[in-house]
Amino acid sequence: MDEPIVVGVDGSAPSLRAVDWGAEEAALRGAPLRLVYASLWERYEGELIAQELNRPVEEVMARDVVGTAEARARSRRPGVEVTTDVLAGEPEYALVRESGTARAVVLGSRGRSGVTEALLGSVSLTVAGHAHCPVFVLRDGPEDEWGGSPRIVLAVGDKPQDAAAVRFAAEEAELRGLPLEAVRAWRRPSGPFTGHDAGEGDPEEAAREVVAEALRDVPDGVATLVRTPEGHTRDALVEAARGATLLVVGAHPRHGGFGLQLGRVAHGVLHRAPCPVAVVPEPA
């Protein structure tokens, strides 16, 4: 069976955006689309039964949510094979399990009110940090901000030899017919003994060399752009992502925890990026 594009749905506006993105991604990759609703309704509402259907109320609601999502996906991409499922369990752990047999997972995430309005929900962060496949996260916000300057933005980290994120970004660029913009920030060493005469070389040139190495195996048909701004990596990526179609970042295994855990850069751009973000797990 072909690996599906899995979309987590809950009936919210961000999750419907995720359905749209998932349908497009499935069409681009020739993959089936799987729409999943997960909840602990059995634990909390087992005694509350929808009388006319003899089923828990939230299960009835869940079936309605996935039915609406299925109709939306079929309308958007009629040629894509669509299946649905309602799972009993914690949404984040259900979706991490789904990621083990998926080509990618797509999630929508709402902002919160007040001072934390730009922060992501725990489900998106948990899945992005522990999934076995790439995870697209679409934050709530004005959709017309996406794609004003259509391109795929790639965060080039300290380990360009870890090529999973590069390959994924290049695939997205090739499938969508968009340029690939590789970004690596740099900072000039500070202190009285860290000038150019100390032997460090030009930090911007070093950043360009790292980017060139990362892009070495990108297909010839993909146009590439290079951006090496001075400053903090997270801030540089958020700025580069303005108007972009997608920002791609890698996630690396970390010892002392379950599976992948997001580093500061990936965590930061998931909270702040003005466009969809794809988190791609790199092999250990």
Give the ranges of each region predicted by the language model.
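Structural beta-alpha unit
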Residues: 1, 14, 53, 71-105, ...
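Small/aliphatic-rich secondary-structure junction motif
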Residues: 1-52, 150-197, 216, 220-223
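Intrinsically disordered or low-complexity boundary/linker segments at protein termini
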Residues: 1-17, 79, 103-109, 125-167, ...
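Conserved N-terminal glycine/acidic-rich loop preference
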Residues: 16, 20-23, 27, 33-35, ...
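Acidic (E/D-rich), amphipathic helical modules within compact regulatory domains
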Residues: 25, 82, 92-97, 103-129, ...
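General small-molecule cofactor/ligand-binding pocket signal
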Residues: 34-36, 83-87, 136, 181-183, ...
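A short acidic, glycine-rich active-site loop
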Residues: 53-64, 199-209
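Glycine-rich, Arg-bearing micro-motifs that act as flexible, cationic patches
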Residues: 107-126, 246-272
